[in-house]
Amino acid sequence: MLIFEKSRKNRRTLAHAIADKMDANDIPANLLRHDAPRLPELSELEVVRHFTRLSTQNFSIDTHFYPLGSCTMKYNPRAANRLASLPGYLKRHPLSPAPQSQAFLQCLYELQTMLTEITGMEKISLTSMAGAQGEFAGVAMIKAYHESRGDYDRTEMIVPDAAHGTNPASAAMCGFTVKEISTTKDGDIDLEKLRQMAGAKTAGIMLTNPSTLGVFERQISEVAKIIHNAGGLLYYDGANLNAILGKYRPGDMGFDVMHLNLHKTFATPHGGGGPGAGPVAAGPRLSKFLPVPMVGKNKEGYDWLTEKECPKSIGRLSAFMGNSGVLLRAYIYLRLLGKEGLSRVAEFSTLNANYLMKRLEQLGFTLAFPNRRASHEFIITLKPLTRAYGVTALDIAKRLLDYGFHAPTIYFPLLVPECLLIEPTETESKQTLDHFIEAMEKILTEIKTTPDLLRNAPHQQLINRLDEVKAARELDLRWYPIAKETEIFIQ
């Protein structure tokens, strides 16, 4: 039931003093209301119960296993939230002078230092407010680099066919023409096609490594050589950095610039539309183009580095210093784990993914790349089951909800038909993985015996299967409900 439908006239949430009546003549006539505001009227208890009930109907990391591939839905330690909310940080005004913000600036400076070491880059800017914005900034830096050299003919950006959708979008927003490079049957970049494609118009290539196919790009050194010899640069999409923390650094692979998704790799909160953070790191060729502000250190302490100190910067991407609360959470996460802890993140995320992959293969599910070891995630294709029983990846995703699991990513990457992209993360126990395997085994039996059970799933949720075509074509969106075929507000 909607909160508007629970409304009853003259119910109030809080008792408060009645404000002094203002003479209506003091207010311009065009600003006066003619009708009561269309807001629900409920008691405080009714409001609390309503939103608490809604929260229990959500799937979240705090309540369910959430193997959403390419999203790294790991547990966010509560200690980071608690420490980042200390009054000294929480109540600091963005315009506070640097001498009064030394502790805050020290945290950001040390975060910069740790992230440059983790990535193998020269410098980093923390100001981007999301991974997509950081990605845009990195591509803009590549453009600024070529233009600073008078190389205006480099108008093409190479993007793999398995890339995240933000990759071609960022390239297009920066004015580049996107050139798609295909992937081989083993999940690697097609080097022969890359050699043919790279040339005088190539500005760079955008890669995720490990890729969204769940495998490591084994020929990355050769890819870097081909692009650099053609005069281009390498952009690293940090979406899958979790798999290689402390093991292999993007800078050592030959990448020139990258962004990091703090909400994935460094356990800051997901969802809700933000706040987020997508720091941008760069090697020697591009570090002078990083967005400002950054934090510097001198003999007097810590201070902001702005356009004055960084004249080649592409400029500002956000007001003040981006989402500093998110940055503090990532800083605390890194301090809690330390260098050895970060290496264990990569080890356990890879171990969990490979365990899950092998167990599902043993049950009879088809792996997209059966001859490859998984990185931190893997793909199964349901095409054989679709052909035999008419059950789709969407059907399995819906049925998993009935077993108490959030569905994996479905239909991505696009080049693998009827696929599930599964990422268990390092924070899940073997017992949780085994429960998921049991659910998948039961679903596999249902596919072969009662496929209609899946086609109509979910069966145990508040909202069952929707008519997705109708929902997309016949939108019915409003901020308040109305009675059918009338404009009468539900009261």
From Swiss-Prot:
Enzyme nomenclature, EC number: 1.4.4.2
GO CC aspect terms: cytosol; glycine cleavage complex
Cofactor(s), by name: pyridoxal 5'-phosphate
Pfam families the record matches: GcvP2_C (PF21478), GDC-P (PF02347)
Keywords assigned: Oxidoreductase, Pyridoxal phosphate
Keyword Oxidoreductase attributed: yes
BP GO terms, sorted: glycine decarboxylation via glycine cleavage system
Gene Ontology molecular function terms on file: glycine binding; glycine dehydrogenase (decarboxylating) activity; pyridoxal phosphate binding
Chain positions found as N6-(pyridoxal phosphate)lysine: K264
Catalytic activity annotation: N(6)-[(R)-lipoyl]-L-lysyl-[glycine-cleavage complex H protein] + glycine + H(+) = N(6)-[(R)-S(8)-aminomethyldihydrolipoyl]-L-lysyl-[glycine-cleavage complex H protein] + CO2
Top-rank taxon, per record: Bacteria
Enzyme class at the top of the EC tree: oxidoreductase
InterPro entries given in the database record: GcvPB, GDC-P_C, GDC-P_N, GDC_P, PyrdxlP-dep_Trfase, PyrdxlP-dep_Trfase_major, PyrdxlP-dep_Trfase_small
Subunit structure: The glycine cleavage system is composed of four proteins: P, T, L and H. In this organism, the P 'protein' is a heterodimer of two subunits.
PANTHER family in alphabetical order: GLYCINE DEHYDROGENASE (DECARBOXYLATING), MITOCHONDRIAL (PTHR11773:SF1), GLYCINE DEHYDROGENASE, DECARBOXYLATING (PTHR11773)
Functional note: The glycine cleavage system catalyzes the degradation of glycine. The P protein binds the alpha-amino group of glycine through its pyridoxal phosphate cofactor; CO(2) is released and the remaining methylamine moiety is then transferred to the lipoamide cofactor of the H protein.
UniProt similarity note: Belongs to the GcvP family. C-terminal subunit subfamily.
Alphabetical list of NCBIfam families matching this protein: PRK04366.1
Protein name per the record: Probable glycine dehydrogenase (decarboxylating) subunit 2
Source species of the chain: Coxiella burnetii (strain RSA 493 / Nine Mile phase I)
